[in-house]
Amino acid sequence: MARTDIARRVYNHTWKLDPIVRSLLDTDFYKLLMLQMIWGMYPKVDATFSLINRTTSVRLADEIDEGELREQLDHARTLRFSKKEMIWLGGNNFYGRKQIFEPEFLAWLEGFRLPDYELSKRDGQYELSFSGPWMYTTLWEIPALAIINELRSRAAMRAFGPFALDVLYARAKAKMWAKTERLKALPGIRISDFGTRRRHSFLWQRWCVEALKEGIGEAFTGTSNVLLAMDNDLEALGTNAHELPMVFAALANSEKELKQAPYKVLQDWQRYYGGNLLIVLPDAFGTASFLRDAPDWVADWTGFRPDSAPPIEGGEKILSWWRERGKDPKQKLLIFSDGLEVETIEETYRHFKGKVRMSFGWGTNLTNDFEGCAPTETNSLDAISLVCKVTEANGRPAVKLSDNPAKATGDEKEIERYLRIFGEKDRVEQLVKV
C-alpha cells in the first residue's frame, strides 16, 4: 500500500481536496448495527443529538472557523453510500455471520442522506444539534465529532511550516510505535482500534491502523471504522452504545418501565443479533443498579463492556456477578474501552490474565496522542473530551448517569429523578481527560 506523507498533505491541503468525512462508511460499525434495529423496530421515534464539550477550558468557537465547520458539515450531507460500499456491506461476513444486514435495510440505506443540522455559538462554544427521525439523526454522531476534532487539529497546525510538521509527525509516529512495541510483549493480547470519533485526522487514524496491523500482527483484531475495515481487509468491530438505553428510558411511561429499559434494549438486540454480538454495556444508569436488577438470562450473554468504572475494579465486579450465577468467567469476555492508555492496558491485561477472556478497544489515546510532539510548546493539539449524545427522544429529555458522575449528561432535574430510581451505589467521580 502506498504511504501518505501526512506532513506534506497537511501543509498543502485545502478542505475541497481533503474533506474530513470522505464516506458514510467513515463511521463506527456499531452505528450501522444499531441503525438496522432502529430502522426495523423504531422508525417513528424522533431523537435529537447534541454536541457536548466536557473540556470547557477549550473554547471551540474561538479555535474553529464557523464557515469551515459549515462547509464540512454541508459536505457530509452530500455523501451517499456507493455501489462498492453496498456490495461490501451486503456480501461480507461480520462476526462470522453472512448477510448480517437485511436486504430490505440495505435497500433503504442506499438512499440514505444525513439530515440537516442546527449550529450556533454561545459563550465560546458551538451549539450543534441534529433533530428528526432517530434512524436518520443517529448517523450524525461520529462524523460530527470527527469533523470538529480534525478542524481543531488543522487550526492548530496552520501556523506550522513544512519542517515543523515533519518534526510533529515524526515524533507522533515514534511515540505510537513505542506503544506498539510494548503491546507486542503481551502474549495473547487482543487490541482493536476504537478511535474514530476523537481522532487527530482521518489520515492519522489510517496510519495508526496500518501501524498496528504491521506491528502486532494477529493481536490486532480489527477496527470500529467501517471504511478502514473495508479498505484494509480488517474485521469491522462493535456492538451497541449508550444511546439505546438512553432512548428507551426517555420513552418509558412509568417508573417500572424506566427500570426495565436497559433490559428491554438487550431483548430487542437479541432478536436481531446473537453470538459474539451479545455484549452488555451496563453503565448507562450505573453498573451496580444494572447488575442488581438484571434478569438471570443476561448472564448467558457472551460478555460485558465496562465503560466508565476503573477497568480492574469494574471488571472484578462483573466477574463476581458471573460467579454468583454459576458462570465460569474464563468462558466469558470483557471488552475494555474507556480512555485506555498503554499503561492501563498493560495493568489490566496482567491483572485479568487467566481469569477471563479480554479484548481492548483503544480509542483517543491511539488516534489522537500528540502531547509533547510539537516542536514548539503548545497544548492546542491535546485531545479533548468531546461527545455527541442523544438529548431528547420524542420530545422527552434523555439522560446518561454513568459510573462516573463527571460523564453524566442530561437535564439536571431528570438526572436527580433517575438517581432516585436507579441509585448512586459505586458511582465515583474521576477526571475525564478524553
Swiss-Prot record:
Record carries keyword Phosphoprotein: yes
Superkingdom of source: Bacteria
Modified residues (Phosphohistidine): H242
Reaction equations catalysed: nicotinate + 5-phospho-alpha-D-ribose 1-diphosphate + ATP + H2O = nicotinate beta-D-ribonucleotide + ADP + phosphate + diphosphate
PTM field: Transiently phosphorylated on a His residue during the reaction cycle. Phosphorylation strongly increases the affinity for substrates and increases the rate of nicotinate D-ribonucleotide production. Dephosphorylation regenerates the low-affinity form of the enzyme, leading to product release.
Disulfide bonds: none
E.C. designation(s): 6.3.4.21
Signal peptide residue numbers: none
Keywords: Ligase, Phosphoprotein, Pyridine nucleotide biosynthesis
InterPro entries recorded: N/Namide_PRibTrfase, NAPRTase_N, Nic_PRibTrfase, Nic_PRibTrfase-Fam, Nicotinate_pribotase-like_C
Gene Ontology cellular-component terms listed: cytosol
Protein name, UniProt field: Nicotinate phosphoribosyltransferase
Organism: Mesorhizobium japonicum (strain LMG 29417 / CECT 9101 / MAFF 303099) (Mesorhizobium loti (strain MAFF 303099))
Upper lineage: Bacteria, Pseudomonadati, Pseudomonadota, Alphaproteobacteria, Hyphomicrobiales
